[in-house]
Amino acid sequence: MRFIDEAIVTVKAGDGGNGIVSFRREKYVPRGGPDGGDGGKGGDVFVVADDNTNTLVDYRYTRRYDAGRGENGHSKNCSGKGADNIYLRVPIGTTIVNNETGEVIGDLTEIGQELLIAKGGDGGLGNTHFKSSTNQAPRKATSGFEGELKELKFELKVVADVGLIGLPNAGKSTFIRQVSSAKPKVADYPFTTLVPNLGVVDVGVHRSFVMADIPGLIEGASEGAGLGIRFLKHVARTRRLLHILDIKPIDGSDPVENGRVILNELERFSPELANLPQILILNKIDQVPDADELNELCLHIVAELGWTGAVFRTSTLTGAGVDDVKYHLMNEIEREQEREEEDPMFAQAQKERFERLEAEVRLNTEEQKEAYRAARRAAREAAFNNELDDDDDDGVEVVYAP
């Protein structure tokens, strides 16, 4: 199934039914009072987090959803039937944004979580409500209220504890295959990973966390180059970033410069994202069999990058060092979760930090998209102008017969 992480839809809640004008008509009661019922309520529109879907592809093809209208009122003071609500199922991790105002309506992060996105209109009043001491037979009823109409953007961000970042072919997909049951495509060419992959990492009984692998970043990614920047928003919810660095790139490039590329692109795209705790994984140590040479190379990379955080040496081919990373991540995540439970101030600070991070990532993603669209428009216009300037008749005198 095609992976779609954004969709724009229009939702229309149902209008309320109309109240009616009606009077009692019974034998021996020729002048019965008013008995017009109220209109029924229009249907609401909800979104529901569903763990059976992982893409917004359905909303690329059906872009409008209308709830039903409430029934009109009936005689004998019977109200019209309310319309059924409609429920739009989205993957866990979907954010609902008002596309016209940019306001975030809600975030669906738990299975079965529901969010009201468009409220149905209330039904109109029947003439029973307008009876008074001076008007015993009112001929007045009101129409139902209109349901809400909204244009919304659905934004999917995968829900993961750890995000993998790095250049293409750094070994991210092989790493997630090694530590989880995820089976992303692995090959010897760049951009093998085209969409985010999720894997559940089991560390022990009732101990696990979720890891996300996104397409590799390249230099210029923050300006729209490559695939990774489009999916960088998917690591905005993570607690840790795992920076996978190939210490012996097959193309002969400098691993230090490769590491700087990722750090620079991350900082340029989102300083808040760059401030997330990062762990450096010096990968493919099996490519340097000499222990002294390997140690010297790893120390050189760490020193040149000025890295002060945790560092691990791994081989995703042989599995060396991978378990150490798993246990370290699990312990860090559990320690942070326990502190959030025990310290309300820390929990609130974490919540505010993630809100700032998501807002910054959303803004920067939209700006990058606009810049990319503007560049494409400029390229098309330039190509069109070049075609107009390409005159095959240059230097040829054309004489028109009378």
Curated annotation (Swiss-Prot):
Residues 1-159 form the Obg domain. CDD domains: Obg (cd01898). Transmembrane segments: none annotated. Residues 382-402 are annotated as: Disordered. One of its GO terms (biological process) is ribosome biogenesis. Its EC number is 3.6.5.-. SUPFAM superfamilies: Obg GTP-binding protein N-terminal domain, P-loop containing nucleoside triphosphate hydrolases. Signal peptide: none annotated. Mg(2+) binds at residues 173, 193. One of its GO terms (cellular component) is cytoplasm. GO terms for molecular function: GTP binding; GTPase activity; magnesium ion binding. The keyword rRNA processing does not apply. Residues 387-396 have a biased composition (Acidic residues). GTP binds at residues 166-173, 191-195, 213-216, 283-286, 315-317. PANTHER family: DEVELOPMENTALLY REGULATED GTP-BINDING PROTEIN-RELATED, MITOCHONDRIAL RIBOSOME-ASSOCIATED GTPASE 2. Belongs to the TRAFAC class OBG-HflX-like GTPase superfamily. OBG GTPase family. Monomer. An essential GTPase which binds GTP, GDP and possibly (p)ppGpp with moderate affinity, with high nucleotide exchange rates and a fairly low GTP hydrolysis rate. Plays a role in control of the cell cycle, stress response, ribosome biogenesis and in those bacteria that undergo differentiation, in morphogenesis control. This is GTPase Obg.
